[in-house]
Amino acid sequence: MKSFILMVITMVCAISLEAQNKSFYDFNVTTIDGKEFPLSSLKVLVVNVASKCGLTPQYARLQELYDKYKDKNFVIIGFPANNFMGQEPGSNEEIAQFCSLNYDVTFPMMSKISVKGKDMAPLYQWLTQKKQNGKEDAPVQWNFQKFMIDENGNWVGFVAPKESPFSEKIVTWIEE
């Protein structure tokens, strides 16, 4: 019996360590126009976005942040998601057109995914679950929640949806 308990504890620890050793860079994502997007050794701000949300004007500030820091080992990656009151109903093509026409978005936009629920994308499982990222549970509260990933692919933290892309927490982290 003691052997069985020891074996179970060992397996649980191994599974836990495996999840904690997983990096952001271990995931594959697809751009809004259907191309593979390599996650590389940059600081990354991951944001779930929506076109018909009260926070949609954050696209402008995200673009400003991207323009200011894109040459300093930093990128923003937007993930359209329709998880909150149907505020991102469009197709990938419609979302891309909206972002370009209304906010001149040039930071990488990925294909539409789910950021919560049973069909949550694996990347967002890692971003939101301590058992996956090894750091903290951080369920997505609403559109425009921001996750910070360091240049080694490690989860650093998150910023609430209503906080500005230029919040002190984000800017300090980028400039470290």
Pin down the residues of each PLM region.
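A short beta-strand-turn-helix
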Residues: 26-44, 64-69
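Structural microenvironment flanking redox-active thiols in thiol-disulfide oxidoreductases
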Residues: 55-120
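Bacterial Sec-dependent N-terminal signal peptides
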Residues: 1-22
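Sec-exported extracytoplasmic/periplasmic mature domains
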Residues: 51-54, 67-71, 100-104, 128-132, ...
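Amphipathic alpha-helical repeat scaffolds
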Residues: 31, 48-52
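A short, compositionally biased
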Residues: 21-26, 141-142
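Thiol-/selenol-based redox modules, centered on thioredoxin-like
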Residues: 125, 129-176
